[in-house]
Curated annotation (Swiss-Prot):
Induction of its expression: By heat stress.
Keyword Magnesium (UniProt): no
Gene3D superfamilies hit by this protein: 1.20.1280.50
Biological process (GO), any one: response to heat
Residues annotated as domain F-box: 2-50
Function field: Involved in heat stress response. Contributes to recovery from heat stress.
Originating species: Arabidopsis thaliana (Mouse-ear cress)
TM annotation in the entry: none
Pfam families xrefs: Beta-prop_KIB1-4 (PF03478), F-box (PF00646)
Protein name: F-box protein At2g17690
InterPro entries assigned to the protein according to its UniProt record, in alphabetical order: F-box-like_dom_sf, F-box_dom, KIB1-4_b-propeller, SCF_F-box_domain
Entry keywords, A to Z: Stress response
Entry keyword Magnesium: no
């Protein structure tokens, strides 16, 4: 057998550039000294690296000063955060494994594990894990906007989507809690005028960016940020007129839409409990004299002393909109429906069975897995959490039942509890 350490450096460099995940790059660099040095520049220029983008937040606090009526505003800085989902198996038993989620510090050989269905950090572990004992494969990457200091997910975003541009600046698209699409450009969040829909999710398909709204209508988003209706909507006779959360997912080689079903009556009662007259809109206000600052030291004394009335607003280049209508406690999930586009019938049809597949719905990603590849994973099911909750639940498409992790003695949640931690 030849000496692999003597392969030409140019060839090793080309191999390193074609590695598909950070884990593969770590494995490559650990082979020997020559392989490690050949990949020394890959981390900086590799397509897997996460762009470091700092944002002004979408949500700010506005206040009117007591002394002169001046409108003051306050915000905390935010940054784009990348996380990755992995399948981990024992090298000695690779048939089944676990699902884990880690932030980008993984490239520094540290597992900073996150809750799989949210982005909250799990308890720190000092246990060292040797990659020689495990097989780690990347499933999906995801993005969120988090606080620079707190690293907590910014609550004003429903979705954060990164469009990588070869040789150019990457594009960041978001869906705010108001259901509107915005993009980051010129040091500010930019709104798109004349949006007629409330949006729910993004997907990149064959190089094009699409969004789905709460009625199940797909829209194409051009490189100039024009939003153009694309295709048919989900018919009300199969959705029962639901305008809840819709998510894109690739499953069995096709693009599906997952519709989260909620208690519409409960949602209406919560909406009716709000006084519409209390909703304050500052859109197109004049902020020539506004004092915008970042509280880098956590000192709120000046702000609290000077202000007598304040409000949380979503701020972009078009103005401000009050957050209050979007801060209601969400109702519980009562089920899901799954749809795919029938190209012959030219309409969305309901999918009754996922076969061996299971769908994982996280706050920052939605993807499918082969159930037989994960410990305890139920086929034809959907794993999820309710909003503002951490507990994992599973919905079974065959009987419509929902099982909660804390209330179950079943092994169907074993995939989220690695034995090596």
């Amino acid at each position: 057998m030849g000496d692999w350490s003597k392969l030409p450096e140019e060839l090793l460099g080309l191999i390193a550039l074609r590695l598909y995940s950070v884990i593969e790059l770590i494995r490559f660099r650990s082979i020997c000294k020559s392989w490690r040095s050949s990949a020394s520049g890959v981390n900086k220029n590799h397509s897997l690296s996460s762009p470091l983008i700092y944002f002004k937040p979408l949500q700010i606090i506005l206040a009117r000063a007591q002394a002169n009526g001046q409108i003051l505003s306050k915000y905390h800085g935010t940054v784009l955060s990348r996380a990755t989902f992995f399948r981990v198996t024992l090298a000695s038993s690779p048939d089944q494994g676990w699902l884990i989620k880690s932030d980008t510090d993984l490239k520094y050989r540290n597992f900073h594990l996150l809750n799989c269905l949210s982005r909250k950090a799990l308890g720190r572990s000092r246990k060292l894990i040797s990659l020689s004992e495990f097989i780690v494969s990347e499933i999906q990457e995801s993005y969120a906007v988090v606080g620079r200091r707190t690293r907590e997910t910014a609550s004003e975003f429903k979705r954060v989507f990164l469009v990588r541009v070869q040789g150019g600046d990457h594009r960041v698209l978001v869906i705010g809690i108001d259901g509107k699409i915005r993009f980051w450009k010129g040091g500010i969040w930019n709104g798109i005028k004349k949006q007629v829909a409330q949006f729910s999710d993004f997907v990149l398909d064959e190089g094009l960016t699409y969004a789905v709204d709460t009625k199940g209508i797909m829209w194409w988003i051009s490189s100039a940020y024009d939003i153009i209706r694309y295709g048919t909507k989900l018919h009300e006779n199969i959705t029962n007129g639901s305008c809840g959360e819709k998510r894109f997912v690739r499953c069995r080689g096709e693009l599906y839409i997952v519709d989260r079903l909620i208690d519409e009556n409960l949602l209406k009662r919560k909406a009716d409990s709000y006084d519409d007259n209390a909703i304050v809109h500052f859109r197109n206000a004049d902020y020539t004299n506004a004092d915008l600052w970042e509280d880098g030291n956590g000192n709120d004394d000046f702000f609290a002393a000077q202000a007598h009335r304040f409000i949380h607003v979503l701020h972009d280049n078009l103005g401000n909109v009050s957050c209050k209508p979007f801060e209601r406690d969400p109702p519980k999930t009562i089920g899901f429906k799954v749809y795919k586009n029938d190209e012959e019938l030219l309409k969305w049809v309901e999918v009754k069975s996922l076969g061996d597949k299971a769908i994982v719905i996280a706050t920052d990603a939605c993807f499918s897995v082969s159930a037989h590849e994960f410990y305890g994973c139920l086929p034809n099911s959907i794993y999820f959490t309710d909003k503002k909750e951490e507990e994992v639940k599973v919905f079974k498409l065959d009987d419509g039942s929902i099982t909660t992790m804390s209330e179950s003695e079943q092994s169907c949640f074993q995939m989220f509890v690695p034995s090596f931690l």
